[in-house]
């Protein structure tokens, strides 16, 4: 009855999971071909398990299993069962299973860690439980490893200890355990210790990483933090080496493409081959669409400009979007207040309903439909999926322009910065509310709003007024201005403070004076790190739209370092 709809595929996804849990492989195999979303790691693991049981798994199946299993942070049934079978059949190694346990321990996921240990060493579960509860006590309870199993448990204990006491983990590894672990285990633990030190912006992080004798033994996440620590220390050779050790998929990320190019160009004597390779890397990502894409553009001597507008949509293209039943159902659900359900159906209709998703012109037409209905988040996200053309009217809309621009200019804020922040905070969804209570266009916390209202003399304020767009913009811009002034006009630091609170970036700025991009890449919180990059890239694009002139992201990033003694701290009581 609902064939081809989001609802049908969502139900099929859940049904496949249930069939897998029941071990009803015949029904699972019958329903799997109609599953369009294909984004459930556990469903894919069940499919790989069936292939292995029936002798159809090819040479690539083990690699795919590892990828899905390692991507799951929480304990699951499908990938655990598949890993158990692949291990029993000799298709994956004991090391592959122990690595899953290490990743789970580092992520503080004890059940997922226990599931992995049970596959490879079920007799070790009681000892593993003791290790997880108190790694320091466990490591002090005996003097030698006495075999491979104990080596792996010591490795897990050191990884877990590093998350809470990095210096103690380093001391114990160096003084007691390093000689009793295999080179691979020792490298992994030093990688975990280095990562935890880098997360704390500790200057000794790079010294810990220097103990690694083979960087390819580390996970991509560890290598990413090795790159960040090396950037912070200005060690460009180490940047290059760590990126080269990453997996092929990781090296394709624009972050590491950019920093590899910078590392190639950073030496005292850059060869012609290095210069050519660096320029090829930069050209492969350069463009206006994102943080590192914009920085690559500037490294090539260009600035960020609004790209040419695509050809106008034809009446037929617009009509086809309006006639799309899934898009209309989505818009209707959003209008009824069922935003989550509506967003999921919209994404399914644009990405998955037809193989390969909608074409470029269809995406522009769907985005146009969302723009017309003022469903700005779907307008932006859909338009961002086009590659050969970019419609900046859709990607960087400016709702409430008279309000936002007037309010920003009245208090000395760059309207492009305000728009860049709103685009990231709420996607212009007026009734947006976060899980922690932030509300409205500028996602203001009630306590922050009350403090700001008192600060600017707004009397009679109550938190329910955050639903009013004028009040929300007034308080949001006022708070942003106070934050910006507190951080001496640094858009980068102010964006970090807006997301993570002012106390954290005050601490994060201490240390060496860094170029803004390096400081941003070293923000310890992944959410805030992603946030500041997007806000500043958004700001640069909005400035290009508002002024019609080429813009520089680098100029907005500036440099970040400790506050000088001559700079007085303003608004020290910022919430």
What role is predicted for each listed range?
Residues 99-103, 153-164, 193-196, 324-348, ...:
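Alpha-helical segment of the N-proximal tetratricopeptide repeat
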Residues 4-13, 22-27, 37-46, 56-63, ...:
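Generic helix N-cap/helix-start motif at coil->alpha-helix transitions
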Residues 303, 310-338, 553:
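Acidic, serine/threonine-rich low-complexity intrinsically disordered linkers/hinges in large eukaryotic
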Residues 175-179, 207-214, 220, 224, ...:
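Catalytic glycan-binding domains that act on GlcNAc-containing polysaccharides
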Residues 1, 25-35, 57-71, 94-102, ...:
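Alpha-helical repeat scaffolds
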């Amino acid at each position: 009855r609902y064939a081809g709809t989001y609802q049908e595929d969502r139900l099929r996804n859940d049904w496949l999971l249930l069939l897998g849990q029941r071990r009803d492989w015949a029904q699972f195999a019958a329903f799997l071909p109609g599953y369009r979303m294909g984004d459930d790691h556990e469903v894919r693991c069940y499919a790989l398990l069936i292939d292995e049981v029936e002798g159809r798994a090819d040479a690539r199946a083990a690699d795919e299993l590892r990828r899905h299993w390692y991507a799951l942070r929480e304990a699951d049934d499908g990938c655990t069962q598949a890993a158990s079978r692949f291990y029993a059949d000799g298709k994956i190694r004991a090391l592959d299973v122990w690595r899953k346990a290490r990743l789970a321990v580092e992520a503080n996921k004890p059940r997922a860690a226990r599931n992995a240990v049970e596959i490879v060493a079920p007799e070790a579960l009681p000892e593993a439980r003791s290790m997880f509860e108190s790694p320091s006590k466990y490591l002090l309870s005996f003097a030698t490893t006495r075999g491979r199993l104990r080596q792996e448990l010591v490795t897990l204990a050191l990884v877990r200890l590093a998350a809470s006491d990095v210096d103690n983990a380093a001391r114990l590894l160096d003084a007691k355990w390093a000689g009793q672990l295999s080179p691979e285990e020792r490298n992994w633990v030093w990688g975990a210790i280095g990562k935890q030190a880098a997360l704390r912006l500790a200057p000794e992080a790079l010294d810990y990483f220097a103990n690694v004798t083979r960087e390819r033994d580390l996970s991509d996440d560890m290598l990413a933090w090795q790159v960040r620590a090396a950037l912070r220390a200005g060690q460009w050779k180490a940047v290059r080496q760590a990126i080269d050790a990453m997996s092929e998929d990781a090296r394709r990320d624009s972050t590491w493409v950019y920093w590899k190019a910078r590392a190639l160009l950073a030496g005292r004597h850059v060869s012609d081959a290095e210069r050519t390779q660096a320029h090829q890397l930069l050209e492969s990502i350069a463009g206006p669409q994102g943080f590192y894409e914009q920085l690559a553009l500037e490294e090539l001597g260009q600035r960020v400009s609004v790209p040419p507008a695509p050809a106008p949509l034809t009446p037929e293209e617009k009509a086809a979007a309006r006639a799309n039943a899934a898009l209309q159902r989505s818009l209707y659900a959003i209008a009824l207040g069922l935003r989550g359900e509506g967003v999921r159906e919209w994404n399914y209709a644009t990405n998955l309903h037809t193989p390969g998703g909608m074409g470029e012109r269809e995406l522009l037409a769907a985005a146009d439909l969302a723009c017309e209905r003022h469903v700005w988040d779907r307008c932006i996200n859909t338009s961002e999926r086009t590659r050969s053309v970019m419609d900046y009217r859709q990607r960087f809309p400016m709702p409430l322009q008279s309000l936002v621009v007037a309010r920003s200019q009245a208090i000395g804020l760059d309207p492009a910065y305000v728009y860049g922040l709103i685009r990231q905070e709420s996607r212009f969804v007026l009734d947006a509310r976060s899980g922690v209570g932030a509300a409205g266009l500028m996602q203001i916390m009630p306590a922050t709003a009350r403090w700001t209202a008192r600060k600017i003399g707004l009397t009679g304020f109550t938190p329910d007024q955050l639903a009013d767009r004028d009040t929300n913009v007034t308080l949001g811009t006022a708070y942003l201005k106070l934050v910006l002034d507190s951080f001496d006009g640094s858009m980068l630091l102010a964006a970090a403070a807006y997301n993570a609170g002012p106390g954290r970036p005050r601490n994060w700025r201490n240390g060496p004076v860094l170029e803004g991009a390096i400081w941003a890449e070293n923000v310890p919180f992944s959410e805030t790190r992603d946030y500041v990059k997007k806000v500043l890239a958004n700001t640069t694009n909005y400035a290009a739209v508002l002024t019609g002139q080429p813009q520089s992201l680098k100029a907005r990033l500036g440099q970040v370092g400790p506050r000088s003694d001559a700079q007085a701290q303003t608004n020290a009581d910022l919430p």
